[in-house]
């Protein structure tokens, strides 16, 4: 296995570990989630380049679109929570509240 793939998998693992450790703050969770999406995007791009198939080129672009939508929704949620509560703690959220 080439070292670039090992580095990308290590970046994904560190981002996943950060997501598990810093799950109480929304901003930290969003940053770790973006790190995971970035490492998945780079891995999919490298795989598509190695396969030399035009059908595999759409997968990284689709993943990039999903990452952009996730970032927009996450930042909107962060702004809404921080303006309402003044904090970015996830325990302030509840689906039972109106």
From Swiss-Prot:
Keyword Transport found: yes
Protein name: NADH-ubiquinone oxidoreductase chain 4L
Topology relative to the membrane: Multi-pass membrane protein
Disulfide-bonded cysteines: none
EC nos: 7.1.1.2
Subunit structure: Core subunit of respiratory chain NADH dehydrogenase (Complex I) which is composed of 45 different subunits.
Broad enzyme group: translocase
Lineage, broadest ranks: Eukaryota, Metazoa, Chordata, Craniata, Vertebrata
Single GO cellular component term: respiratory chain complex I
